[in-house]
């Protein structure tokens, strides 16, 4: 596996790969890799000749009171994991390489219809930071395929919309959620869950699945279902951020006649904010 810190090195290596007729798969990450990240890399390997992973803790997508400075930097371990599963290239730029003119002067990419709801409502500017850095990474790597995890469903939907709107020639693939044995979605932020909270930390997943089953059983009182699910989370000792029954494509509140629905939620533990989602198809 080759390790790059500079854009020119990435472009040179991938240019040679393309000249040899190879397809390029890309998995952008912020590092602190776990099995869910590695599954995305393996998925990219199944569909492309060479795979590049980026590790960049993007300060532009963190809010003022968020955990950018606390986000784990584990490059040595991450590189070892990627090398073990056969990743071809690892791109780890410094902030000045990605934002040479500084973040305040950086041109921004915004998906206005989807970025200010759900996670975007409680994390203003977050998705603007995501779409800006992903656009830059797409321009650097120019992948044939990019793989994003379904756990970050809103991010996935926004990236798909951005690629469509800006005519970016990349296929976006979705990687399934990887879960712990009790249903908790794997996340780098799970390390902030306390030992006392951990046995109850799967409550968000349980409440989302409870809503899913209720809809499949015929309930269409979506507002009531959302409120009841939030109460379940509160009863378990956590603070719900949001729980929304949404149209899977637009992320707008689901209508009674929608057939593709995603139930998304976020909750706060003592020191972490966890997100999760479940999707379902409804026959009306």
Swiss-Prot record:
Chain sites annotated for binding (R)-pantoate: 61, 155
Pathway: Cofactor biosynthesis; (R)-pantothenate biosynthesis; (R)-pantothenate from (R)-pantoate and beta-alanine: step 1/1
Positions bound to ATP: 30-37, 149-152, 178, 186-189
Cysteines joined through disulfide linkages: none
InterPro entries listed in its UniProt record: Cyt_trans-like, Pantoate_ligase, Pantoate_ligase_C, Rossmann-like_a/b/a_fold
Residues the entry annotates as binding beta-alanine: 61
Record-listed E.C. numbers: 6.3.2.1
Name used for this protein in its record: Pantothenate synthetase
Originating organism: Saccharophagus degradans (strain 2-40 / ATCC 43961 / DSM 17024)
């Amino acid at each position: 596996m080759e390790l790059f810190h500079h854009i020119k090195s990435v472009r040179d290596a991938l240019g040679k790969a393309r000249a040899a007729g190879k397809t390029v798969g890309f998995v952008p990450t912020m590092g602190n890799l776990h099995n869910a990240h590695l599954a995305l890399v393996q998925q990219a390997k199944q569909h492309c000749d060479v795979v590049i992973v980026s590790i960049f803790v993007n300060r532009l997508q963190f809010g003022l009171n968020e955990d950018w400075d606390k986000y784990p930097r584990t490059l040595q371990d991450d590189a070892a994991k990627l090398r073990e599963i056969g990743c071809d290239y690892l791109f780890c730029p410094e902030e000045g390489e990605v934002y040479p003119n500084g973040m305040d002067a950086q041109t921004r990419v915004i998906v206005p219809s989807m970025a200010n709801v759900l996670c975007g409502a409680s994390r203003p500017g977050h998705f603007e930071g995501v779409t800006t850095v992903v656009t830059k990474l797409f321009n650097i790597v120019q992948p044939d395929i990019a793989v994003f995890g379904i756990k970050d469903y809103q991010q996935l939907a926004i990236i798909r919309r951005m690629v469509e709107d800006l005519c970016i020639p990349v296929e976006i693939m979705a990687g399934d959620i990887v879960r712990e044995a009790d249903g908790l979605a794997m996340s780098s932020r799970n390390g902030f869950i306390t030992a006392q909270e951990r046995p109850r930390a799967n409550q968000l997943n349980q409440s989302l699945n409870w809503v899913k089953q209720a809809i499949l059983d015929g309930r269409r009182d979506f507002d009531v279902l959302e409120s009841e699910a939030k109460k379940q989370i509160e009863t378990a000792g956590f603070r719900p951020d949001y729980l929304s029954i949404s149209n899977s494509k637009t992320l707008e509140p689901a209508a009674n006649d929608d057939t593709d629905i995603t139930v998304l939620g976020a909750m706060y533990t003592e020191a972490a904010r966890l997100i999760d989602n479940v999707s379902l198809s409804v026959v009306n």
